[in-house]
Amino acid sequence: MKKLFREIAISVFLFFGILFATLQVDWLKVLHLTPTIIGDKLSELVWDFISSGLYEVDSEKVCLPIDTLVHEMCIANGIDTASVSIVVARTYEVNAFATVGNHLVVNTGLISEMDNETQLSAALGHEMAHIQLGHIQKSIRQNAALQAILILVTGNSRSNNIRKITEKLISSGITRAKEREADESGARYIDAMHLDAKEMAIMFEKFKDDNSLSYFKDHDNNQKRAAHIREMHFTSKEPYRQILSPETWEAMQEVCR
């Protein structure tokens, strides 16, 4: 029995030792791969992995308003509309996230919690900024070995837990400095849309004490984020735009609730 435990302990030690050593190697240099090659290939695998666990919403009452807000954001900020792919996922989890392949996933749970189109645009703008600033691709490169190992080990597994681990691996490369950078860029995006960028601060303050909500739990202190946004200078003044009609907004909210 002792021999068996010793063999198991040695095997576990060797496994994690090899895994740790693997993560210390810059495989891009060793294998003479460019970031584009490894990023594109791994992105395809990871997105297939993540998207398989999403229940995608196809209701026009939801998708069209979201597409409209993103389109207006892109036009106002000189962003190629083809550079981002929007996916609306049916789940009560209050969350939105940018992920591989320039995909931006927004949950119906987040949409239903927003007070108005500007707050929703602020959440979309923050995630759009992660994509435009290259944060996601950098994170993919940093965790390439571990993500590849996870996919190989789990094979065709499509469990929700494995999907969440994969998402966490991507978000783990997003530092607080990058989060602040995304906040700032996201606020400027909605300011350029002639929306009230201070609504981003109001959104943070609204959820400052609710750590159960995934979107706000995974980010930096919301009170500090709100204060930082309020300190920023914005050019748009009242009266602000209204992009979606009240009827369109309410219809979208009704489907998402």
Predicted features along the sequence, with ranges:
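A Zn2+-metalloprotease active-site environment signal
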Residues: 1-257
